[in-house]
Amino acid sequence: MVRMDLSRIRNFSIIAHVDHGKSTLADRILELTHAVSDREMREQFLDSLELERERGITIKASAVRVRYRAKDGEEYVFHLIDTPGHVDFTYEVSRALAAVEGVLLVVDASQGVEAETLAKFYMALEHGHVIIPVINKIDLPNARPLEVALEVEEVLGLPADEAIFASGKTGEGVEEILEAIVQRIPPPKGDPEAPLKALIFDSVYDAYQGVIPYLRLFEGRVRPGDRIRIYSTGKEFTVDKVGVFTPQGLVATEALEAGEVGWLVAAIRDIHDVQVGDTLTLADRPTPSPYPGFRPAKPVVFAGLYPVDSGEYGKLRDALEKLKLNDAALTFEPESSTALGFGFRCGFLGLLHAEIVQERLEREFGLSLIATAPSVVYKVRLKSGEEVEVHNPADLPDPTRIEEILEPYVKLTIFTPEEYVGSLMQLLQEKRGRLVNMNYLPGAQKRVELVYEAPFAEILYDFHDRLKSVSRGYASMDYEQIGYRPGDLVKVNVLVHGEVVDALTFIAHREKAYTMARAIVDKLAEVIPRQLFEVPIQAAIGGKIIARATVKALRKDVLAKCYGGDVTRKKKLLEKQKEGKKRLKAIGKVEVPQEAFLAVLSAGRDEPKG
């Protein structure tokens, strides 16, 4: 077997803000290293999910191995690990970054440094990586590469003269990037003879071969026939195949050694056995310590998912199980609702993650779903001294037992052109944000960095859309969790015809509860079909009704058959109708149609503007 020379390996990642051209740049690198023939080339080659290509974003980390003959005449092996750019997938990025020695930090020459660029930059710094700044999209008419290079130096402290100007579209500067990877990024360290120590940075599920973990080997080697052990669970498996990634797919090899990036098949059936971020070692010669700094991904946003047709409950469970195989961050547990029947309470990393999971369930598994309003995890301190977590607003304990309710807060970093600062500050004030810092950036563009602290629940719903509309799309944001703080929060129940509809219950700040409740009852009154009796729709905090709307009754024209004639006859018919309605009202049940839930999700969450 040919030993890989470690000094000829370069492991690197590309990090960027959404839309700064990361995937296009990866495409050019594949082309220039002749890894992909022109015939096979397609846009966003590494984004394998149909949804990724359609939305133009990278959701899962993906790896590829290419060979490059450098100007010094030597042939190098590059392992490129592509990372997601969206803030929801920060944990995926941190794992991908742990598997490499250097990163290309891609910044759009027309946009400059954005909020997520900064967040990813700090992660790469924490790992102690070599960072090569790449100013991309220099072919754009409004590109200002020199200014952006100076901004990178000012904001991130990376010397402007080290920046490489490139265009993923035309291919200009890409050769220079490849040379910089060889020159600046250090080769991996590691001893192939030491006990095996491999980091799992991603995994995919294959119907025939089970779970295929993606590995970066730090020490030792692994080959078919080896007995491996998963560090955190202690489970053991026998390796069937090992191999590397090529752009055309997975290719089996004889062995994987320290410094390499690859995959293995070992008939692993359960995704929970190989948690991403876990360490893999040999059963008979385990490594003394696992790879540090990993935690299981923890969901921060919860929503109920229910099948429109209750007969598809089993199908939904199987679909969620399958998605979880590729998505360690997704959690779900069964829940039932009087209004929606049986479904699941699902946990996500953020709103985009929730949206993508729902879209994949509908697309790949052909399900029709209803999602309840997303909510954050509240902590409740009870008078008895214990603390409970509340994932579903309907589960909030009785107010008489509650000492205080704590809500999660986030630190927001926002980059915006100067002229939008006023309207953004107004938006953040409305969202109960508190200004921590404000920093004017150098350059002719006059951009400002705003740092705020705000309740997570406030920025969960429509904040991103409103941030974009207030700033005409120029502002960008990134957030991180900063812990829990007490808040003046109340649970609002929505009653239709005197019955609480659990799926519409929400937790809100006391000051905002009234406006949100008003919007919800008005919207419900529009979408609930009229009955033969009038239907009151109310919102209540405890026993106090704070908003009400009424669906007016339908009336049959009982006088149609009376021509002229005696007025007492007409009165008798009308009285009879009234009596009948009274009886109906007492025993009548109102079905809340599915559209009503969807309508409320859009209504109740957009607070009235103005």
Curated annotation (Swiss-Prot):
It comes from the Bacteria. Transmembrane segments: none annotated. Keywords: Cell inner membrane, Cell membrane, GTP-binding, Hydrolase, Membrane, Nucleotide-binding, Protein biosynthesis. It is found in: Cell inner membrane. The keyword Protein biosynthesis applies. The keyword rRNA-binding does not apply. It catalyses: GTP + H2O = GDP + phosphate + H(+). It is an enzyme of class 3 (hydrolase). One of its GO terms (molecular function) is ribosome binding. Residues 7-189 form the tr-type G domain. Required for accurate and efficient protein synthesis under certain stress conditions. May act as a fidelity factor of the translation reaction, by catalyzing a one-codon backward translocation of tRNAs on improperly translocated ribosomes. Back-translocation proceeds from a post-translocation (POST) complex to a pre-translocation (PRE) complex, thus giving elongation factor G a second chance to translocate the tRNAs correctly. Binds to ribosomes in a GTP-dependent manner. PANTHER family: TRANSLATION FACTOR GUF1 HOMOLOG, CHLOROPLASTIC, TRANSLATION FACTOR GUF1-RELATED. NCBIfam families: lepA, small_GTP. Belongs to the TRAFAC class translation factor GTPase superfamily. Classic translation factor GTPase family. LepA subfamily. This is Elongation factor 4. The lineage of its organism: Bacteria, Thermotogati, Deinococcota, Deinococci, Thermales.
